[in-house]
Amino acid sequence: MSQNTLKVNELHEDADFDENSTETEIFDEKALVEDEPTESELAEDELLAQGVTSGADATQLYLGEIGYSPLLTAEEEVYFARRALRGDVPSRRRMIESNLRLVVKIARRYSNRGLALLDLIEEGNLGLIRAVEKFDPERGFRFSTYATWWIRQTIERAIMNQTRTIRLPIHIVKELNVYLRTARELSHKLDHEPSAEEIAEQLDKPVDDVSRMLRLNERITSVDTPLGGDSEKALLDILSDENENGPEDTTQDDDMKQSIVKWLFELNAKQREVLARRFGLLGYEAATLEDVGREIGLTRERVRQIQVEGLRRLREILQAQGLSIEALFRE
């Protein structure tokens, strides 16, 4: 992506949002105030902008462009926001440029999720623009509180649309989003990540339903990474729900699973156990990273690392036998 695509005057302004749903969102300033840039983070950005860190990459160049726009005071926000709502272009630009570092801060939290940092920033900038267009200063909260929600939405939507190879039915996506949004809201109020029981209580839903959807979300997030080569498919693609397939498709899926099981035994014992427990093979029920770690006495991060190593080794085994990843799939 070109450096110039991130300049404010070249950003697209027609991001696709469902405004009917977003208008009903409740923005909690106390819950989101942590997303405002801290002094240390702003100092870090300024050092990057000045090229203090080694290697003047595109991120540093971009930070150099935005690093000298001062943050607005609360009074200035109200002044410029009112003028922006009346169509004053310079005020709108001032609102955007003064909050570009907020986008960078939030975008950094989504690193290693399938998109480069500059791509995340560009998506977040679209959310910032929309926030400026819709911000009502008379409602009494700071602009950064309001903008944070829009920035998150555009970044998360981009990650979902550009990195997922699994497409869920729309009613499942909507239900899952309700649970995830509730989990985020609770995490701001509590001093820990909410459990399935706490989410279920908040929504007055059965705990089993919430647990099932949260497991589904983790499997999609961690398993939908392409296995490699020329294939865009992932391991979860071939472990499909038999209830959604016809008899012929079910037979093909069974053959695929048997092939995977055979190659699993060419991995080392730890890789084989982790993959089997994660994806419901060798008699195990599919489990989350946390559950697998609990069962075998490892941290969640170590389980994830072993999973990545195992999938990489599985690809090497296939290639050594003259097979491609596509050999596991039949349309």
Swiss-Prot record:
CDD domains: Sigma70_r4. Pfam families: Sigma70_r1_2 (PF00140), Sigma70_r2 (PF04542), Sigma70_r3 (PF04539), Sigma70_r4 (PF04545). It is found in: Cytoplasm. GO terms for cellular component: cytoplasm. Residues 15-25 have a biased composition (Acidic residues). A motif (Interaction with polymerase core subunit RpoC) lies at residues 119-122. Keywords: Cytoplasm, DNA-binding, Sigma factor, Transcription, Transcription regulation. This is RNA polymerase sigma factor RpoS. The gene is rpoS.
